[in-house]
Amino acid sequence: GLEDIPDWGFDGSSTMQAEGTDSDCMLQPVYYVADPIRGEDNILVMCEVFNADGTPHKSNPRAYLRELSEKYAEYDSWFGIEQEYTFFIGREPLGWPEGGYPAPQGPFYCGVGADEVFGRDIVEEHMDKCLKAGISLSGINAEVMPGQWEFQVGPLGPLAISDELWLARWLLYRIAEDYGVNATLHPKPVKGDWNGAGAHTNFSTKSMRENGGLEIITKACKKLGENHSKDIAVYGAHNEERLTGLHETCSIDEFRFAVSDRGASIRIPMATANDGHGYLEDRRPAANMDPYRVCAAILETVCGD
């Protein structure tokens, strides 16, 4: 178990987390999965970073989410995160003609065939390895822009979803490396008339999932609207390049929620509206968001006073 994995230290000055004169940072194991690459008894360990005096390092947002998930445990919050990403070879997205552009968007989303999808072998291996590790991957699909893909993790509680998303991201980068391809989480990897990359975050509390939950979801959407400018600040860097009001986004300067509207900040799924209970989809987080910060923001806004 976790108690068998020792604390560890590292040189924080090499990762821009400390000064060279006081460089030691502490790693405390908090979660682990089977290592699907090395196999046998090897494991991948997620750690929190602490200062030498035992306080959480300023780069450790998990510590705060840990507090919040205890504080709001009675809400039984579930999160499901849709992680979009883009494959590149050098300076070109995977599958794009060198120095040029592919056909306009349309045939690539959930596409099939070598003229429509690029990198499926990496995606399939990533999916298999995540499942082998015990990560709660719930789906994959080719995205709207060629060379862009998505995987989904969850639904899980706030800490579990965040830990598993970071481990799944690490595995994505590591597996793509073997193919000579790099993945990026930049929210707008190609300028112009191309979709950006997001991390749509689906959220529900126990009462939202029960009969009459739609009313509670609507109240939550209103609270998210009141806190839009505060929350958007932790929803990922360069997000303003993606949230333009085009390409299935709402402008970063606006807030709207609606049923089935992919141009809204928050989408209430059609099935949720029809059933009268379910979940909401926050479409604002960028692909490069930190799930610890996003889950904390949603918990505080929706469950707080």
Per-region residue spans from a language model:
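Short, well-ordered alpha-helical packing segments
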Residues: 69, 84-86, 127, 169, ...
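Short, contiguous, pocket-lining structural segments
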Residues: 114-122, 139-145, 157-168, 172, ...
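A generic structural motif
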Residues: 49-55, 114-115, 155-161, 205-210, ...
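A generic structural signal for well-ordered coil/turn residues at beta-strand boundaries
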Residues: 4, 43, 81, 147, ...
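Short acidic (Asp/Glu) and glycine-rich catalytic loops that position anionic groups and cofactors
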Residues: 43, 195-206, 270-278
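C-terminal accessory/tail domains of diverse enzymes
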Residues: 160, 171-181, 209-305
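Histidine-centered divalent-metal-coordination microenvironment in nucleic-acid enzymes
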Residues: 84-96, 142-156, 186-206
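ATP/Mg2+-dependent ligation/transfer catalytic cores
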Residues: 1-142, 164, 181, 219, ...
